[in-house]
Amino acid sequence: MAPTPLLVETARKLEPGRALDLACGSGRNSIWLAEHGWTVTAVDRSPVTIPSVDTHLADLEKHEFVIEESAWDLIVMCLYLQRDLFGAVKRGLKPGGVALVIVLLMEPGHESSPFRVQPGELAKYFEGWEVLHYHEGKPSAGEHHRAVAEIVATKPLTKR
């Protein structure tokens, strides 16, 4: 399975460093990052073995994995929403580090769901950061067709 197109587009512009892939699933993004020089840690509650990647079996909802503070150059969270993780993601990035988050978006005519963000909600979690990409609606690229909110944001070099 191919990596998320937004991840490829974003990571190609960055100097490889330490990457954290939260709720990595099959590991497609972790594999791509590792193949392109990143030192990757992947976390998921389902067992996954990925060559050249430090994998952790952990349930993020139960806080079984602690995100190290100021340790990561890139943190990826694709198609997984746990609102209370955003603070840890922001603290986990080094100054100048990049967060890439793709989550399902609430669509008109659909019932409210705790697994989807409201329009504008994702951007609020990264207020004060440099937003390199923000999109709401059908994915900017990729294989699924559900409405999403996507953000790529850089942590400020100084505290705000």
Model-derived features: where do they sit?
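A short acidic, Gly/Pro-enriched loop at the edge of an enzyme's catalytic core
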Residues: 66-74
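Core SAM-dependent methyltransferase catalytic element
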Residues: 140-160
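Conserved alpha-helix/loop element of class I SAM-dependent methyltransferases that forms part
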Residues: 1-17
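A short glycine-rich, Lys/Arg-flanked "PGG" loop and its adjoining helix->strand segment in the class I
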Residues: 86-98
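Conserved beta-strand signature within the Rossmann-like core of class I S-adenosyl-L-methionine
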Residues: 97-105
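Conserved SAM/SAH-binding beta-strand->alpha-helix loop
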Residues: 46
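Conserved class I S-adenosyl-L-methionine
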Residues: 17-25
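Conserved SAM-binding strand-loop segment of SAM-dependent methyltransferases
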Residues: 52-63
